[in-house]
C-alpha cells in the first residue's frame, strides 16, 4: 500500500496508472483496523501497520519524476528500504509500540 492516502491526481496524469477512491478508502480502513485490533488483542499481542511510500518498480518516467520531486529524500523506495522498519516492528525492540501506523515514505507525506 502506498503512502497514507494517494490523493495527488497529478502524479498519475499521462500514465496508465490508476488512482482510485477505493484504494484511499481501504488504506484508511486498514489504519483504523490496526488500532481496533491493537485494542482488542492487548496486552498479549501487539498490532502495528506500515504505510510504505512509492516503491520503484519500473513505473513510467513521468510518474517517477513527479514523485521524487515531492519526496524529501528525492527518490522512490526500494524493497530494502521497507525491510528494516518491518523487522524492527516484529522484534522486541518495539515491545512498547502497538496500535501505530509507521509511515515509511522518505518524507513524501510531509510535503
Residue spans for each PLM region:
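A short C-terminal helix-loop "cap" of Rossmann-like NAD(P)-dependent dehydrogenase/epimerase domains
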Residues: 58-72, 76
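Conserved functional loop/turn residues at catalytic and ligand-binding sites
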Residues: 37, 75, 92-93, 110
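Short, small/polar-rich loop/turn modules that mediate ligand/substrate recognition or access, typified
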Residues: 42-46, 97-99
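Conserved SDR Rossmann-fold cofactor-binding beta-strand/turn motif
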Residues: 46-56, 90, 103-105
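Short-chain dehydrogenase/reductase
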Residues: 34-35, 83-86, 90
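Short C-terminal tail/terminal secondary-structure segment
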Residues: 10, 16, 86-87, 98-111
Amino acid at each position: 500500500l502506498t503512502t497514507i492516502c494517494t490523493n495527488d491526481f497529478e502524479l498519475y496524469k499521462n500514465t496508465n496508472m490508476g488512482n482510485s477512491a477505493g484504494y484511499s478508502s481501504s488504506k484508511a480502513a486498514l489504519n483504523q483496523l490496526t488500532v481496533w485490533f491493537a485494542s482488542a488483542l492487548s496486552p498479549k499481542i501487539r498490532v502495528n501497520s506500515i504505510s510504505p511510500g512509492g516503491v520503484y518498480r519500473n513505473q513510467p518516467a513521468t510518474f517517477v519524476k513527479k514523485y521524487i520531486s515531492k519526496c524529501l529524500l528525492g527518490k522512490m523506495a526500494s524493497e530494502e528500504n521497507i525491510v528494516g522498519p518491518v523487522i524492527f516492528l516484529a522484534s522486541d525492540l518495539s515491545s512498547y509500540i502497538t496500535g501505530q501506523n509507521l509511515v515509511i515514505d522518505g518524507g513524501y507525506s510531509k510535503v
